[in-house]
Amino acid sequence: PKAWAAFRMAKEVWTDGSADSVAAGSLEAYAQTIIFPVGNPNDAYAKYFIGQSYTAPVVTDGVPVVNVTFEPGCRNNWHVHKATKGGGQTLVCVGGRGYYQEWGKEPVELRPGDAINIPAGVKHWHGAAPDSWFSHLAIEVPGENNSTEWLEPVGDEVYSKLK
């Protein structure tokens, strides 16, 4: 838990703390407020997102870690990380403001430093708030026979209820 404070401290050192001031501004302005690169357009998975997302691999050996950035209003479809043993995903918010929601539960707001552990088999989605850029580290939890099942889009009737 104390290690996560390093992300918040690094952000304070390398930015002027104005992440909220670029909430719905340009990608270039937002990129200056986070400590990981935004990366490239997430074309490979675009069909599973509403809006534009970007990915930047942070760790490629061992346990994969990717920085995923969502433009304001962008979210991924409902999906499930599957595994026969272990598996799942951990999200660590590193910039902006976003949401995570499990099927049948209320959405959880995510801000820099917040972390969510998603066990294998849990239907969920995550993405940016309607008025803010959002970045999180996506950490694949080691497991056996890991896969992701992509499901239906998060409809406007669900997304429009976010505050």
What are these regions (language model features)?
Residues K85-P112:
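A short beta-strand-loop-beta hairpin characteristic of the jelly-roll/cupin
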Residues R75-N77, Y99, E106, I116, ...:
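Histidine-centered metal-chelating micro-motifs
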Residues V66-T84:
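Conserved short histidine dyad/triad with adjacent acidic residue
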Residues T69-F70, K82, V94-R97, G104, ...:
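A mature extracytoplasmic/lumenal domain signature
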Residues P57, N77-A83, E102, E109, ...:
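Short histidine-centered beta-strand/loop micro-motifs
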Residues W4-A10, W14-V66, N77, S147-K163:
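A short, N-terminal "cap"/entry segment at the start of jelly-roll beta-barrel domains
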Residues A120-S147:
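Ligand-binding loop in jelly-roll beta-barrel domains
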